A protein has these predicted regions:
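Active-site nucleotide-sugar/metal-binding loop of Leloir-type enzymes
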Residues: 1-11
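Short, high-confidence coil segments that cap the C-terminus of an alpha-helix
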Residues: 9, 40-41
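Catalytic-core segments of class I nucleotidyltransferases/pyrophosphorylases
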Residues: 12-13, 20-33, 37, 50-54, ...
Length: 135
């Protein structure tokens, strides 16, 4: 559901529930927030290099050049499930159910998709196999 229409805030930090977040991420959250507001951008996705992922099966979502995200045939960075977004990027969405990939692709096409690299280990509860490896 598109909750942006019913909210009053301009900027949002969102966290996916299937990533194992811990206190080591606090520094990265703070750095992301500082970068986001200092550079007056409208989106910032936390990404990690594939070799920092507990689940080695991830193929990669993006590549990162400076702080710009883009997609190629082979991608070396994984989206962690954390992003800071400004409500303005949702203005053209006229439906209640949509995929964030639609917005990311649009921003990427305009070369306005930004990323921030985390140096933390990325643990995503992909499936029961990964869950069992953690225990």
């Amino acid at each position: 559901y598109n909750l942006i229409k019913d909210s009053e805030g301009e900027d949002f930090l969102t966290l996916n529930h299937d990533t194992l977040w811990n206190s080591k991420y606090i520094k990265t959250f703070d750095e992301m927030q500082e970068f986001y507001f200092k550079n007056k951008i409208k989106n910032l996705l936390m990404v990690v290099k594939k070799n920092r992922s507990f689940d080695v099966r991830f193929k990669g979502d993006f590549n990162l050049n400076g702080n710009k995200l883009f997609k190629e045939i082979k991608n070396e960075f994984i989206y962690t499930g954390c992003q800071i977004l400004n409500r303005k990027i949702f203005q053209h969405i006229n439906k209640n159910i949509f995929s964030m990939s639609e917005i990311w692709n649009d921003l990427s096409d305009k070369k306005e998709l930004y990323g921030y690299e985390s140096l933390n280990e990325f643990v995503h509860l992909t499936d029961i196999e990964i869950y069992k490896k953690l225990n």
